[in-house]
Every structure is written in C-alpha cells, then in structure tokens.
Amino acid sequence: MSADSKVQLTALLRAALKSIAPELADTPIHLERPKQAGHGDFATNLALQLAKPLRRRPRELAELLLAELPRSTLVAATEVAGAGFINFTLAAGAKTAAVGTVLERGAEFGRGARNGTSVQLEFVSANPTGPLHVGHGRGAAYGASLAAVLDFAGSDVTREYYINDAGRQMDILALSTWLRYLALYGLDIPFPPNAYQGDYVVDMARAMREGHQDRFAGFTIEQVLEGAPGLPVAERKDDEAKTQREDHLDMLIANAKRLLGEDYHFVHGFALNEQLGDGRDDLEEFGVHFDKWFSEKSLFDTGLVDRAVAELEKRGHVYLQDGAKWFRSTAFGDEKDRVVQRENGLYTYFASDIAYHLNKYERGYDRIIDIWGADHHGYIPRVKGAIAALGLPPEKLEVALVQFAVLYRNGQKASMSTRSGEFVTLRELRREVGNDACRFFYVLRKSDQHLDFDLDLAKSQSNENPVYYVQYAHARVCSVLEQWGGEAAELRAAQLDLLGNERELALCARLGGFPELIQNAAADHAPHQIAFYLKDLAAEFHSWYNAERMLVDDPALRLARLALATAVRQVLATALALLGVSAPQSM
C-alpha cells in the first residue's frame, strides 16, 4: 500500500466525480489513513465537501460516487461511514506489492524525488560559553533529524550553526578564564558570582598557562579591581544588588581589556576556540553535523549590521529616543518597540539578528527554518517584523520551537544551571544512556511539547524502552536471516501472494505507508512521526514473529515470509538512520 495506491485511488475518485459533477472535476481530493483499523486503508471526505455546492446529502453523494467508481483490482471493498465518509480497503496484492518495492529499492525506498527546493536550517547555535547541556541536546537531535527527513523527502538542506562570538557573554567567558588563570599565579581575586563558574573554566585556565606560561599575568589585585563597585552579600537578591553585580563584572571586563591590550583578543579567542571546539566534538560524537558555522562577529567585520540598521532607517522604521535607536516593531505586531543601537553606540543582539537574517535572505534560499528554544517564542514577531520592514517576505522564515527536556533519575528531577556550574551536560547524558537512546528519546514528542526524559527507562533492556524495542526488531530479523543462510537475491523471486494472514497484510500496509510518512514528516517539521512509525512497525513485527514461524518447511512460504522480514529490516534501518540511531545486527 504505497503512495502509488493513493495516486491510483485519487484517479478513481476523480473519474467518478467527473461522471456526477463535471463542473467540479478539479475539486481537491484528500485521502487519509483512518485512525481505527476497522475503517479500511484510506478514507475521504469528498462527499462532505461536495454536499453544499451540489445541494445533496453527503451520504447520498457518497453512494453516487461509489456507484460511478471505475472497477479496479486495487480496491477490495468500499463503504460509506458516518456522515458521508468513504472508506476504502485495498486488495491484498496492493499491500504485498510494497515488499517487492522495498527489496528492489533498498535504502532508497521512501526517498522523494529531488524537488529543487533549497532549505537553510539553523539549529543549536548555543553560546560557546560552556559545554552543551541536555537542553541543547534536544535541539540538536530535533534539528539533525529534521534536516535528514527534509533531505530524504527531496530538499537540498544546508545545516547551519550560528556562533554567538561577538556579545557580552563571550567577554564574561574571557574574563572568567583570565581570573582563573591569575588565581593559578596566586592572585586571590574574589570570583564574581555572575561569571562562569564551571570546572571547565579552570581547565581552560590551566591549558592557557601550559601553553603560554605567565604571558597574561603580572598584575595586582588593585589593578584588576580598579574602579569596580563592591560586591553585595550573596544573600541579597534584589534588583539593586543584581545591578551592582553586573556593574562590577562590566568594570572587570573593561579593566581586562585595558590591562591586557592586544592580548585580550588572544584570551577572548582562546576561550572561544576551546569551547567551540569542545562543542563541535560533542555534536560530532552525537552524530550531529553542520555544513556551515556562521560567525556573528563576521556580521560586524563586513559592515552588515551597519547596513541592516541603515536600511531600516532609510525605510522610516527606526527612530531616536534618549540617544538610542529604536526599531518600530509595534508596527509589525510586536508588543513594544526594540532598541537596535544603545546610547553608547553599541548594537544590541537584536541588531545582529536582523543582519544575520538579512544575510540568510541574500543567500537566496527558498526556505529558511530557525529552531529556537521555546523561551524565545516572543522573539518571533520582532524578527519577522524586521524582515518585513526590510522589504523581504517574512513568510519565508519558519520558526520551530523546542521545549526544554527535563531529566528524571530514580523518579527525581535533575537540576541544571549553566551560570552556577551545576548542570548536566549533553556529554554526561550520552555517556550514561548512550547516543542511540538520547537521539530517540529526544524526538519521541513534538518539539514544542515538554519532554520528560526517564534515564532509567532509557538504560533498560526491556520492551518498555522504545529504542530497545525497535532495535530488537531489527536484530531479530538479522538473526532469522543468518539462520536461513540464503542469498538476498533469492528473496526477489518470493511469491508475495502467499502473505495472506492479518498480521502479514498489516505489516505490508505499514511498509507501503513509509514514503507518504516521509513527506508528511517533512511538511510538518515532525521527526517524531518517524519515531511513532518505528514503534508501530516494531510492534507489528514482534506480534507477527511471536505468532508465526519464519523458517517453515514449505519453501515458497518460507521465502515469502523472509522477504517480508527483510523488507521490515530495511525500513527499520532507514527510519532509524533518519533519527541518527543505529540498527544493530545482534543484541
């Protein structure tokens, strides 16, 4: 039951429609797979669509359509259901044909024709100020899987990581590294609570000392702290205390730049490269690859931020207030106007984001997809507003949101905070449960739904663990084929019409729906549909495996069942690969 079956059914309905209402022959025909097994293989609401223009009752129209439906070996049964839906049950041969198609196409089964659409997909884009954490991991798994699905569906995908290397957070990381470095030389400066606290900062400081000895030392505590306001006691959480801590940090950054001179750029670059390199390695080990790493700093170096803001000014969308430049984002649906350039002349993060999206548009992609954390939901109107203000089509930009993943260990939530240094890193998670469990569990839900990640379940070797359950189905087929010991070429001669019991036909139908699933998952930005499909396919295979023998005495039936099992193995492997999960031959 493949996409071809759907095309053929559509053609049959079109012919029937021409017979009863030629003037409506071009009406779009929608065929869907019923959610309940007893409602056939496909259903259409065409009669309900036509009821009003034809002034007929839907059920009456459904009966008329079926009466005019051309005869076809594709259809085994039809029925009118409910208010006027038409259900179709396909002939067994239409379902088993999918097995032959899978064996013929192999790993290419389900791949869509190249559609000429170029897609720029930006994801993860975490500040390179510390190790990637489990929240970044979900965005990475979702983005990588979506990219794979879009590519498999026929698009040309560029996977891009935006490096936030030009903002204040990088200055804080550089300062944090330098202060830890100075401490190695005995300079006991109180470490700011709002600097980066993790052990990785100490590791970077040690690496900097090992490579450059005392090149960045030789300063006094008084020099480093010059002009910095005192730090309030840790217990104070009020706004004034927060402002004092931030002012203290900013003065230390200014002092570091002044004292180090050109060497500050080296320390800044050292910290950036250490963290960026660590993040790249982490992602590569996770099976997440990028085609392009785009530097925020390059937007300033090439003058694109200046140009973007100047263009907004030229178009009348920027005004001056209190010495700052504001973008009129309220004119484009935002809740308030946004600063693009502060009174001190420094651009905001928003200004560089505008320039970055202008760059994306100028590169000529057909579609631009940003994957953001769900906490950035309010950012969408201002970015799309800026795009529209630049005279560009905002609808070209699509934003997919990813909710946070919450880890549970022994039934307890695991806490995390990147600025306090107490966080669960992606690397730690991968080492605990493995890459496969991480990649699969991260896409088990829609990206914009909260995800509770059960560590104990992810590590268990049981049918309750979905990734284990799916991989075990693949390994089971491999074991059966090894016992058989025949050649794969023999399977193409299998008499597929011998596959006739309910479980076998259900498996065939599931396989046949894979190409359509790929297109739907790509259109909906929904790799979780692949995960759901894998769980269903594995469940149907295990049910069949437990009920029937593969290696029966009858050679023809044995070959037919082995052909079906091999087709199941292929689709399992293909779908798992799209999610970045391995397909083991034994378990």
Curated annotation (Swiss-Prot):
One of its GO terms (cellular component) is cytoplasm. The keyword Metal-binding does not apply. It holds the Pfam family DALR_1. It is found in: Cytoplasm. Keywords: Aminoacyl-tRNA synthetase, ATP-binding, Cytoplasm, Ligase, Nucleotide-binding, Protein biosynthesis. A motif ('HIGH' region) lies at residues 126-136. GO terms for molecular function: arginine-tRNA ligase activity; ATP binding. SMART domains: Arg_tRNA_synt_N, DALR_1. It comes from the Bacteria. GO terms for biological process: arginyl-tRNA aminoacylation. SUPFAM superfamilies: Anticodon-binding domain of a subclass of class I aminoacyl-tRNA synthetases, Arginyl-tRNA synthetase (ArgRS), N-terminal 'additional' domain, Nucleotidylyl transferase. Monomer. Belongs to the class-I aminoacyl-tRNA synthetase family. HAMAP family: Arg_tRNA_synth (MF_00123). This is Arginine--tRNA ligase. The lineage of its organism: Bacteria, Pseudomonadati, Pseudomonadota, Betaproteobacteria, Rhodocyclales.
